[in-house]
Amino acid sequence: MPKQDRAIRTRRTILVAAASVFEEHGFQAATITDILNAAGVTKGALYFHFQSKEDLAYGVMAAQGRHMGVVPPRACKAQEVIDTVLLQTYRLQKDPMVRAGVRLAMDQHASELDRGTSFQDWGKGMTLLLDAAKEQGELLPHVVPSDTADLVVGAYAGVQSMSQAVSGYTDLNHRTSVLLRHIMPNVVQSSVLTTLDLAPERGAAIYAEIQALMEAEELAGASA
């Protein structure tokens, strides 16, 4: 195996191990020794890629952002907002890296970390979608996209945190759908509202859609 490929695989192994440890113990209680044991790598290999526990945490948080995936563009941007939230819901239930990144962002004991970046990045993405929705006439006149984006991100953070505590995310689909059913009527035009799909199971369908698109791209690249 080429050195570069081996280094990429080692870095990935360390991040997956760190995600597992951070998800289970939180940032403060997690130790480098725990992560080394979970990864099965040497201390030298770990420190080649990550300089500290904080560096590892930022690596996990960045990776969970990439793992969230990007919803394929929708003609209706309000639906794209909804799909972004529902895809995150599915990822939280299925992807340990996403769960670990969210736990780190929500961990009030992790005072050493800049936890606000995750929320700000998601808020910026939501604002762009809502700006596009407003340009297309999908939003009610009073809606300020940046304010609504912050509301959606903050409310969702609370809902997912409650779901994690109460059911280990097993009821997050339902809770997310309820949240969206309460928010969207105050955000979008009634003519748009009737077209929106807020079904709890939609997140899984979006994930399958993304996987199919990725596989098609890989096949196209292989045959080129």
Predicted features by range, described:
Residues 1-25, 29-41, 51-58:
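Basic, helix-initiating cap at the start of DNA-binding domains
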Residues 64-67:
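Conserved phosphoryl-transfer catalytic core
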Residues 59, 69-98, 149:
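Hydrophobic alpha-helical connector segments
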